[in-house]
Amino acid sequence: MNKLLNNSRIISGKIYMVELDQQPAKLLRVLTETPTHIIFVEEGDHGSDVFERNKQDIQGIYELKDWYEANGM
């Protein structure tokens, strides 16, 4: 599985599987990226939540297909 965060291949507006520190992996849309942070949108049935994370707090960002294939789903 290719960790996109290490390769600077993140596309704004795209949905990725994201592993954040001390949280289970979840689907998040990347809104934009700064040199130190990534701003995400978490979309749900009752609306959206926009938040930022320091890149050092992100364990990995993966293409959905790669994530599901690697985890046997």
Regions from the PLM with identified roles:
Residues 15, 23-51:
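Basic/aromatic-rich interaction segments and small domains that mediate binding to polyanionic partners
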Residues 44-73:
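Intrinsically disordered, low-complexity, charged/polar segments
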Residues 1-9:
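Mixed-charge, Lys/Arg-rich low-complexity intrinsically disordered regions
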Residues 4, 35-37, 41, 67, ...:
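Residue-level signal for functionally critical sites in structured catalytic/ligand-binding pockets
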